[in-house]
Amino acid sequence: MSGVDGSLFEASCLDSKMVNVGKIEKVNPQIILDTFENGYIPVVSSVAKAIDKLGIYNINADLAASELAISLHAKKLILLTDVKGLMKDPKDESTLMERVKVSQIPLLKKEKVITGGMIPKIECCVKAVREGVESVNIQDGRVMHSLLIELLSDEGVGTLIE
């Protein structure tokens, strides 16, 4: 399904220079709850119904996942990416930070540990935790069975933000 179905996501223009990119203004989780109730696992594409024009907006997928987790009162959010998680040195996988507290994030940004594409991802994590999601895990989706390892073992994968 898409974020347009059931008006799951409603958005307005994020930036006048990027007219097809939106920011989520409202989440209507009922279609997701109905899907769960009928025994299905929803897979949602990150587009939203436009509320300020006729049409749709593209939405950052991490932001869409974060906003949906918040609206569903989820305990955990898992974001898949193409790196092991948050690393002190992005070129050295041995510097993986397995656990990070939200209170540490400003210093990690200041020290340039969090840069580039990791900035919006971490900001989504912080927002989710501050708004009730107990933890967010950033992990490498290329690792075989990474979701199962994270969910069904004590081993854990990636970086846990809490």
Regions found by a protein language model. Name each.
Residues 146-162:
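Short, basic/aromatic-enriched C-terminal tail that caps enzymatic domains
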Residues 1-142, 155:
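Nucleotide/pyrophosphate-binding catalytic subdomain
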